[in-house]
Amino acid sequence: MKINQYAVVETPFEQQVHELTEIGFYDESVTDAMGAGAAAVWQALLVQAFPEYRDATPKLRELAVDNNRDVATFLQSGAPLTTEIFDAVALQLLGFTETVDYQIDQPLQAVHEFGLPLYEKRGKWDVDDVLTAWYALLTTHTAGGLQFIDDLASRGYFAKTNLPLFFNGKAMATFDTSALIKEVVYVETDVDTDEDGVRDLVRVEIVRPDTSVDVPVLFTASPYYQGLNNEANDAKLHTVDVPLSHKTPNKVRYEDIAFPGVTLPDAEQHEVVAEADEATESFKATSHVDINNYFLARGFAVAYSSGVGTRHSDGMQDTGSPEQVLSMKAVVEWLAGNRVAFTDRTSGYAVKANWSNGKVAMTGKSYLGTLATAVATTGVAGLETVISEAAISDWYQYYRDNGLVIAPGGFPGEDMDVLAELVYSRMHDAADWHRTKDQWTAFQAQTDQMMDRESGNYNAYWDARNYLPHVSDIKADVVMVHGLNDWNVKPRQVFRLWQALQTSGVAKKLYLHQGQHIYINNNRSLDFSDQMNLWLSHKLYGVANQAETQLPDVTWQANDQAETWETRQSWGQTETVALPLAGDDEMSYEDWQIESDFESYKRDFNNWRTEMLKQENDRFEVNRLVFTEAPFENDVVIDGEVTVKLRIKSSENFGLVSAMLVDYGEAQRLGATPTPLGQQIDRGTEWQPTPLVEFKLQKPTTEKMISIGHMNLQNRTAPWQVDDLVADEFVTLNLTLQPTLYRLKAGHKLGVILYGTDFEMTVRGNQDIRYTVDTVNSKLLVPFQQ
């Protein structure tokens, strides 16, 4: 077991004593024991580490200091306290199991192996050593995934004062989650997406502590939150079993299709009849974001809104649109005290967020994180930071790629209109649905036309939903989290955002893990929740904890070892090494399957990809080209975007090329889905427990897909420009694959597979097309870490 902690702040001794006093450990029992020496002080601290017991003295007989003595026996002996004795007991307090996790007579070895930030000093300890060691112990992670102080809090250590308390720069669980206030308001936006001449109102649901102090807010913008239309979603899925066809060439420039900016409607504002002292509507809480639950116990309020075009709000649902983003921006403005909201949709009674300190963070994964990123690009006042996980920064890159209709991994046939159908939760209220059904149907028809599945080209519709051109307007600090095996929201989404932020003046932090489309706040080997606690305590409460310098710029989970996280300063090499593909002049493959295979691969595209990745597979002999480099003599790291430079021709005047970058070599590899460890993490005190998980090494495999990419052969220049393609004439293109950060082990080979139809992601026309590659004039450009 290894635990990687980056949120432990180095603290001067005087400050340690002050904080121990603030949280109740440095009390009269400790000061009374000081005259008796270090062991007596240790005893006074130990008995406070069992909050379930009125008198914890008998517990000292359950803690061993070595093979022969328990703590009580040790204290009676008068022997000096040492690092070995302290650590032997600390490991037990932290929940590690002797003989399973460590040996009682080798505590220091275990501490170093686990990576625990415990205090260490040779020889006999004095009182100050004990206090410093106890402070360090409280910041150390248990085997159950919590700081020890948070573990104690989950067992009732803290009185629920409903007042903020900070330890080692992080907020403590001192708020009563059994008495949270739940209330609803309706925020007036600047948009009128249903075109009724009145500004749209959006429903906001708030959960906050019952406290006398103003608190900051975590806001999650989630179109999913008010309910889903799964049947309508499934009925609207597009068929992907359609042929590719020739596109009429053009000379379109980006300037020709650039989105000119949103024009706000001249819509009527809602009349304010009177000011209400407080909200008048409550709600029954549904499933919430786990990390938000964590912060509710620590003095942060949480707000959720689904935005326009969702249940109990006005307007039409328009995936990723400027209007959707502006509706979420309006919520931030109300939370920061800069916009009006009402107690309901009709009375005109305005209500203020008079419980808020005016500082807001946005959180969430996938669509939720996407809207956090998008709102940040508006530069809205009051938004101090965003924590965006697996977030989209450019919707074209989600449903399209290089002139092709591309499905997010696992969702063939989905598109912007399908996602809108899923979350148009106004369907859930019969009267509202019947009032809006005709307008919604017409609105969806317009979306279908503008998103243009027929060509797959980038146009003004997509440009309006590309947030990258507006990164320079971001004023909030940004935390990004992404899985390098996320083929739903692919890594390019965060890579391009990270690169664009390099010239901004905001603080930015990046976490790259080996998972797919997941949260990582309940991962045992990384103190992610602690790090976000440090970050938000600084950004929203103003705690001077050096969060911006304490947290690494880039935290990367190594792909070749379990429970190993490394820190870096950057991601993305600009220098590349050119590797040849092969020595033959020309090699060909076909993009046609016999009907039985075609139907089989459609039904199970996961099995298709597994078989396709194998270096030797006669079944795909004519449907792909596999190129491999010589085995590496030493470990190498691929850092950024790999480009396949191709000279290729199609037997038709249309075509596509797909490529997979592959690690060939037998090894145990981490699973992309974390394994539950059979334990729950308490998010406060008996509050919203969540499963503790870890990425585990799986059974050995001989290959692993590192990255992937696709391109329409007629969009070689740009996704908005259609180039001509003549049958059986070579063209040259650069196919840039999804970015990665990947360590190839010595003895492994780097491979690239070229093919046509991707049964999971591209259209599947099963057309009889033959592709030929000029391998002499083709190469692989790889950004190896320098």
Predicted ranges, named:
Residues 5-161, 172, 229-281, 285-292, ...:
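Accessory cap/linker subdomain of secreted extracellular hydrolases
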Residues 474, 480-482, 486:
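Short beta-strand/loop motif that positions the catalytic acidic residue
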Residues 502-518:
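Catalytic histidine neighborhood in serine/cysteine hydrolases
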Residues 168-217, 223-226, 231-234, 239-276, ...:
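N-terminal cap/lid segment of alpha/beta-hydrolase-fold proteins
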Residues 487-495:
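Conserved alpha/beta-hydrolase "acid-adjacent" motif
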Residues 211, 316-323, 330-361, 366:
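Gly/Ser-rich "nucleophile elbow"/oxyanion-hole loop immediately N-terminal to the catalytic nucleophile
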Residues 296-312:
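Conserved alpha/beta-hydrolase
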Residues 4-12, 279-280, 546-786:
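Glycine/threonine-rich phosphate-binding loop and adjacent beta-strand/alpha-helix elements that clamp
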